[in-house]
Amino acid sequence: MSAQKSPAELKSIFEKYAAKEGDPNQLSKEELKQLIQAEFPSLLKGPRTLDDLFQELDKNGDGEVSFEEFQVLVKKISQ
């Protein structure tokens, strides 16, 4: 997936993965892993781990990633 998607496309992709388990408006760590592996496969190559990325994105510390928190990742990728 290119980070150059419209906001509606990004929201749709987020919701597709978030709806797999638990809260359909939040990504669990497993859902985030599935999304990254399918949509951003090169993101976790190198020293960065899923745990590092999840901790960085989960700004409020609730153990899930909201769409707003996910947008931080998209912005970083598109730079």
From Swiss-Prot:
Residues 13-48, 45-79 form the EF-hand domain. The modification N-acetylserine is found at residue 2. The keyword Repeat applies. The modification N-acetylalanine is found at residue 3. CDD domains: S-100 (cd00213). Keywords: Acetylation, Calcium, Metal-binding, Phosphoprotein, Repeat, Vitamin D. It holds the Pfam family S_100. The modification Phosphoserine is found at residue 42. GO terms for molecular function: calcium ion binding; calcium-dependent protein binding; transition metal ion binding; vitamin D binding. One of its GO terms (cellular component) is cytoplasm. Ca(2+) 2 binds at residues 58, 60, 62, 64, 69. It comes from the Eukaryota. Ca(2+) 1 binds at residues 26, 31. This is Protein S100-G. It comes from Sus scrofa. The gene is S100G.
